[in-house]
Amino acid sequence: MKLMIFTGLVLFAIVSLIEAQAENEKPCLPEYKVCTHVPGNCCSDLVCDCYGRYKSGAQIGRNCFCLQKGVIYKREN
């Protein structure tokens, strides 16, 4: 009986450890994906770049996207 309880606890610990590792290894976000709420999840060659949205001079929100490092984006008219 004690052996069964011990085995069950060991199996539970192993499954919990595997699930915790899987959560830490979430896939990275590819280019142009939204990263507003997860700024550290962009793939290694990308950076989470944020832009404010304004209406009548007041900020109404913020958008963040995974973009290439060192690239400057400009608005076209």
From Swiss-Prot:
Record's keyword terms, sorted: Disulfide bond, Secreted, Signal, Toxin
Prosegment residue ranges: 21-26
Reported tissue expression: Expressed by the venom gland.
Gene Ontology cellular-component annotations: extracellular region
Predominant location: secreted
MF terms in GO: toxin activity
Domain of life: Eukaryota
Keyword Disulfide bond: yes
Keyword field contains Signal: yes
Subcellular location: Secreted
Post-translational modification: Contains 4 disulfide bonds.
Pfam families linked to this entry: Toxin_35
N-terminal signal peptide: 1-20
Family: Belongs to the neurotoxin 19 (CSTX) family. 08 (U8-Lctx) subfamily.
Protein name: U8-lycotoxin-Ls1p
